[in-house]
Structure formats: C-alpha cells, structure tokens
Amino acid sequence: MTDRATPNLPSRDFEITSAFYGELGFTSVYRSDDWMILRRGEVVLEFFLYADLNPATSGFSCCLRLDDLDAFYATCRDAGIRETTRGWPRLHPPATEDSGLRIGALIDPDCTLLRLIAND
C-alpha cells in the first residue's frame, strides 16, 4: 500500500453525511458507531461522529485535488447543490487564483469546507 493521508472530518449524522456524499459518487467502505469512511475513486474521506457540532462555528476543512475539477463540480451541481454565498451545503465556482491554481469550494451539510483544486 502506498503511504497516504486522509482527512478526518466531522459528521453530526452519518446517515445525512453518507446520503450527501453518495449523491457525489462516494461509497461507504467502513462504518461503525463513531467512524465512517467514504471513497470515490482514489479520494478517501474519513468522518468521526460529532453530534454536538455547531456548523455555524465549524472550522473544519480539507483539500480535494482533482484530475477533472470541472466534472466533479458538475456532479455537485447535478446533485442540486446551489452556488450561493449563504447557508450550507453550497458551492463556489472554480476560479484561477493569484497562485495560478484553479480552485472551487464545496461546503457540506456540517459546514466543512472542501477546497476543490485542479491537478496540473
């Protein structure tokens, strides 16, 4: 197995989290009472149960580095996630930043920020 790191993200409710990410093509590969692992291709997200999380004050985030940012973004839009600046879940469209990186954003139902970064 290749060395790797995976983000550990909060979930107030595994059913809601699993359904949300399932619409984006993620499948469950492990679940217990307090831990869940979802996979979409080579992208693995691990979730811990955090029932008392206040999404409005959550500072959790991670980066998804994607070979096809546009396709993943389209999947998010097709799942009904809106481009807006308020509430969650929500999307922010990809744009080229000063760094030269093309980055969008997905905010999940627990207000976790997933930066969507196009691979070179």
Task: Locate predicted features.
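Short glycine-enriched loop/turn motifs at secondary-structure junctions
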Residues: 1-3, 54-59, 97-98
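N-terminal beta-strand motif that seeds the catalytic metal site of vicinal oxygen chelate
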Residues: 1-15, 62, 117-120
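Short aromatic/hydrophobic contact patches that present stacked aromatics
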Residues: 6-8, 37, 61-63, 103-105
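Conserved active-site tyrosine of GNAT-family acetyltransferases
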Residues: 17-22, 111
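Conserved acetyl-CoA-binding loop of GNAT-fold acetyltransferases
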Residues: 24-28, 81
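Conserved short beta-strand elements that form part of the metal-binding/catalytic scaffold
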Residues: 29-60, 64, 113-118
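Vicinal oxygen chelate
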Residues: 64-110
